[in-house]
A protein has these predicted regions:
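Conserved functional acidic sites
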Residues: 7-215
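Sec-dependent bacterial lipoprotein signal peptides
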Residues: 1-5
Length: 215
């Protein structure tokens, strides 16, 4: 019994596979409040365990957009420990574990990380993207459901875990409304044996000075 307990997989392992050779292709569709639309494809690949970090081995994942991530999985959940962009010489360790899924995998489990804006823009400033001025915004994640059914171009998936992220960014909306708390909402679906299958992001602005959008 002790041997079997030692071999038990960390919570959430089947919902976010880390083993080498896995590959995901995502179609991203973004739409802004001014009716602008963009389409792109992003590919994520698992490269297996490596020892690039001073803190020890971790699972290496790479995006074709030029971003690398290192993750670990244990009894507390699945979390990122470092990241690297094309302009970084070395991986940058996260100050604290950045959870993707936190144990227990149960409705109500919550945790905090940071996010930024991906869609919201100012209408008359350069650069227009809000993220340049607000690179880190606190976001609270909560597991909302354990048995969602999700249908995407790759197929239909069941028994999926739905996670909601909510952040508030205080911005000057316009002279009439002044400063407003802008909600940044993310929904993510993780499905057994597959991983992340769907993401929805909403950044509404409803302002004459700002343009929001959905992804």
């Amino acid at each position: 019994l002790a041997l079997l307990a030692g071999c038990k997989e960390p919570p959430g392992s089947s919902l976010f596979p880390l083993e080498e050779g896995r590959r995901w292709t995502y179609r991203l569709s973004s739409e802004w409040e001014n009716d602008t639309r963009e389409r792109e494809t992003v590919v994520l690949s698992n490269l297996g365990r490596d020892s690039a970090l001073e803190s020890g081995s971790a699972w290496h994942r790479r995006s074709d957009t030029g971003l690398d991530y290192w993750l670990r999985a244990d009894a507390t959940g699945i979390y990122r420990v470092a990241a690297k962009s094309d302009v970084d010489a070395e991986p940058k360790p996260d100050p604290t574990p950045r959870f993707v899924l936190k144990a227990p995998i149960a409705v109500g489990t919550s945790w905090q990380t940071t996010t930024t804006t991906y869609l919201m823009r100012r209408n008359s400033e350069f650069p227009p993207e809000i993220r340049h001025a607000h690179p880190t915004i606190p976001v609270v994640w909560t597991i909302e459901a354990l048995d969602d059914r999700v249908e995407v171009p790759a197929g239909r998936f069941e028994q999926c875990v739905r996670v909601k992220g909510l952040a508030l960014l205080r911005l000057f909306a316009d002279p009439v409304n002044g400063f407003k708390d802008m909600p940044l909402t993310t929904l993510e679906w993780y499905c057994p044996g597959v991983g992340l299958v769907k993401v929805e992001r909403r950044e509404p602005a409803n302002s004459t000075f700002l343009t929001g959008g959905t992804m």
